[in-house]
Amino acid sequence: MKVSLSFLLTILIVIITIKVNLSQEIKISPFFANNLKFEPIPDYIEYDSDSDAGEALFLSNYLDDHKTAKQKSCVDIGAPFQSCDKLLEIDSNLRDTEDFFTFTGFITVNETYNSNTFFWFLESQNGDKNSPLVIFLQGGPGGASTFSLFVETGPYELLDNFTLVQREITWNSEFAMLYIDNPVGTGFSFTDSQEGYSNNEDEIATNLYTFLQQFYKLYPEYYTNELYITGESYAGKYIPAFSYHIIQQNQNSNNPNINLKGIAIGDGLCDPITQVTQYANLAFYTGLADLQQQEVMFEYQDKIVEAINQEQWSVANDLFTDLINGPPDYFQNITGESDYYDIRKTVEPTYGGDFTAFLNQSSIRAMIHVGNNYFQNNNDVYIHLEQDIPKSVKQLFPTILDNIKVILYNGQFDFIVGPSLTETMIRTIEWEGIQPFLESPKIIWKIPSDNVDVAGFVRQWNSFTQVVVRQAGHMVPLDQPARAFDMIDRFINNEPFPSG
């Protein structure tokens, strides 16, 4: 059989294209990989992602008409939230009712590049309009906060038949929750230009601040409420940068004061140059590596630190990938484990529903006002931030700690950003309160609903709290929802952690 040269060239091009695409997918998210596994779409689900989903809602067009903005952005998602028809009965102020609603839409953060940030805002289910406003930011870079809404902290859990059920334990039961797909290009957030993507934490913080200023104009009832910024993993970079930017802007008398009270970072990458030095010891003392393998990991760590010190950012990223963020990588080769989110598990777990496929249904996209925009894991987000990943935000903590409350928490069994990585970073913060904090006793923490089992360990001094949550991995609210809620509730409400 004769095979033409053009046919062979075509096959070769296809193979090369596939390899390139696969290599790009592997690089999407080094610290919060968006390749978390989900069940495939069941055969009996009619997947209608290609159908028209109507017009997207750009709320920046309604900054002078917040009544219309609320009516247009309201989502009829069902219990426990009120029907949007009931919103029409309210004159304009959400504080006029104890009913609670949920809202979605886009806010334009850069008109030049048509950069638009998607959000999902859920009023507190307790009906108290004075409830703190809690922003949740996912990691990545490129992890959508919608993940937490459906998998960790939000009021809904997605089953594998595309059915939403109410989550038994949700942060939304006591707090107004604002999930932001950040940075631009993540999830439903998008930009029309490569110039619209963020290249560093300053640009991300500026976009988030622009977003928040407009959010308060659209939902002015929440402007005076206490604000907390929370998140996990690579959001350990976003949250300090964003909160520091707010503090700086608050000190400018020309800007309206934002009532920021605290930040909460779970298993956060904040200072790569110190945190990366802990992998060899962590692997050895948990029995995952022997002495010889520990030495190899020490060599990797030293090379990463050297690359960071020399500002060779791409080299540092590549070395990190070789050490732990493949596959293939050294960690997986010596342990046989691919789940660095939880050392108790060999492979990443499969979650009960594919929230990406669920959100991309045309009926859902129409309901949440995104139109024909699609939820995506955008590799461009990572590419633009690649040079910023090894850089630190630790230098921002002294100013933050002098102005607001801070809680840093870790899951006991997380490997990628485990407790020892956070502890090492904390000990190098140049803050006047760091020594009394380190000298404060660690207490054993138990929650009222389970006064037998130890929930975790807490160290606290003035505005600074550190928590290790027992029996949890990288995603604490998923692994230990009751403990995570008790922790965040006590932190926000200034309640002491009960000891055993």
From Swiss-Prot:
BP-aspect Gene Ontology terms: proteolysis
Keywords: Carboxypeptidase, Glycoprotein, Hydrolase, Protease, Secreted, Signal, Zymogen
Domain of life: Eukaryota
CC per GO annotation: extracellular region
Any one Gene Ontology molecular-function term assigned to this protein's record: serine-type carboxypeptidase activity
Pfam families: Peptidase_S10
Disulfide bonds: none
Matching InterPro entries: AB_hydrolase_fold, Peptidase_S10, Ser_caboxypep_his_AS, Ser_caboxypep_ser_AS
Catalytic residues identified in the record: 233, 414, 474
Function: May be involved in the digestion of phagocytosed particles in the lysosome, participation in an inflammatory protease cascade, and trimming of peptides for antigen presentation.
Gene3D superfamilies: alpha/beta hydrolase
UniProt KW Cytoplasm keyword: no
The enzyme's E.C. designation: 3.4.16.-
Localization, UniProt: Secreted
Signal sequence coordinates: 1-23
Family as reported in the entry's similarity comment: Belongs to the peptidase S10 family.
Glycosylation sites: 110, 161, 333, 360
This protein's name: Probable serine carboxypeptidase CPVL
